[in-house]
Amino acid sequence: MEEFQAYLELDRSRQHDFLYPLIFREYIYALAYDHGLNSSILLENLGYENKYSLLIVKRLITRMYQQNHLIISANDSNKNPFWGYNKNLYSQIISEGFAVSVEIPFSLQLISSLEEAEIIRSYNLRSIHSIFPFFEEKFPYLNYVSDVRIPYPIHLEILVQTLRYWVKDASFFHLLRLFLYEYCNWNSLITQKKWISTFSKRNPRFFLFLYNFYVCEYESIFLFLRNKSSYLRLTSSGVLFERIYFYAKIEHFVEVFDKDFPSTLWFFKDPFIHYVRYQGKSILASKNTPFLMKKWKYYLIHLWQCHFFVWSQPGKIHINQLSEHSFYFLGYFSNVRLNPSVVRSQMLENSFIIENVMKKLDTIIPIIPIIRSLAKARFCNVLGHPISKPVWADSSDFDIIDRFLLICKNLSHYYNGSSKKKNLYRIKYILRLSCIKTLARKHKSTVRVFLKRLGSELLEEFFTEEEEILSLIFPRASSTFQRLYRGRIWYLDIFYFHQ
């Protein structure tokens, strides 16, 4: 029981009590528009300027209230419908100030926890490709998978309330609610989706912090239930989702069933359940029967409804067999297929044929959505036939080739983990031919004449680094080259793409 209390009680060192004064520091608004802001920069700049400037924020808030509400153009989409000012300048400045103010103490907490665990900060970063080797290792032994999309709160107040368990600063929350009320015009309990969408687009940093904190709060409860599931009875777990009385109910629940009903205490545990999330989408997979997967499904639904007041329809969370259905995650369609193999064994005069079936994870490129994206960017038509890019025809030959190469290499690096490379070859073909057609259009020539003049040197520019290395080590016709070239390659250094 002490272990539960130690896990569930909020660490007082994590409760930051004085965020309100940070709003009035001069350097906050300089840091807010530093796009390269990270934890190390925060640490370096915390002692930069200790002067308060109440006048700065007072002027911003005053100007927000002094905007002429009548001077609004119905056709001007860039104007704030409530404040009547182009691009929401003052609201964005204040929202960025809020974001930096709450980021600073939580960044300090993260760095201090890493230092206590003696973890180097740079090593804590993980590539998004590191998820797929985990899939390859674990998922062939699992049977069921559930594709779960974390629902958005219907009201921004829910996002604010999640901070109340960690930040004990009433003044900060009064100012925060005042700002959000003026921005979103909360006249009803439920805020329409368009206001959350507008708020997230115009204040991305602030909204992302609130949303990420909401996801962190949800996962902290969910992972607690996952790790301590052997203590939860199936028929009575619903009462555990009232956050205020969460700790007391856990304690009372365990004591009562331990002392009074030892014979009816029923443990359940699923040691083979796995949870993976990226942004707002998560994957839940298990080796056991679908019964336990259904229990976890309704745990999540009740958690969202009772604790975060977010409605999620049970019918939208499907539980599928990995061997029969594929799931979409991080740009890949993945499923588990049976890979039969036949081994012939001979002992003296007798020979035996042994059939062995192994499960293997398949990762497939979603070619149709990619072709739609390429068609939208005018690299091909909707059928996937390459076309020229007339917008780039005014650039130099080097710039045109470099742009196409950058896109091709980014897509090649990311989708080299595909188990079937046919779709990847098709994407490369579209980009190569689109590049050639763009160059031919610039020089007012045909594709055939242009290729005949340049030869095959232009096509070789589209070879990726690993293709060049393999071609130097092995002959192109060798079986080793073909096997390695068709194999899956995961790049564990991919964090973002060049824009």
UniProtKB/Swiss-Prot annotation:
<keyword id="KW-0507">mRNA processing</keyword>
<dbReference type="InterPro" id="IPR024937">
    <property type="entry name" value="Domain_X"/>
</dbReference>
<keyword id="KW-0694">RNA-binding</keyword>
<dbReference type="GO" id="GO:0009507">
    <property type="term" value="C:chloroplast"/>
</dbReference>
<comment type="similarity">
    <text>Belongs to the intron maturase 2 family. MatK subfamily.</text>
</comment>
<keyword id="KW-0819">tRNA processing</keyword>
<dbReference type="GO" id="GO:0008033">
    <property type="term" value="P:tRNA processing"/>
</dbReference>
<keyword id="KW-0150">Chloroplast</keyword>
<dbReference type="InterPro" id="IPR024942">
    <property type="entry name" value="Maturase_MatK_N"/>
</dbReference>
<dbReference type="GO" id="GO:0008380">
    <property type="term" value="P:RNA splicing"/>
</dbReference>
<dbReference type="GO" id="GO:0006397">
    <property type="term" value="P:mRNA processing"/>
</dbReference>
<comment type="function">
    <text>Usually encoded in the trnK tRNA gene intron. Probably assists in splicing its own and other chloroplast group II introns.</text>
</comment>
<dbReference type="Pfam" id="PF01348">
    <property type="entry name" value="Intron_maturas2"/>
</dbReference>
<protein>
    <recommendedName>
        <fullName>Maturase K</fullName>
    </recommendedName>
</protein>
<dbReference type="Pfam" id="PF01824">
    <property type="entry name" value="MatK_N"/>
</dbReference>
<dbReference type="InterPro" id="IPR002866">
    <property type="entry name" value="Maturase_MatK"/>
</dbReference>
<keyword id="KW-0934">Plastid</keyword>
<dbReference type="GO" id="GO:0003723">
    <property type="term" value="F:RNA binding"/>
</dbReference>
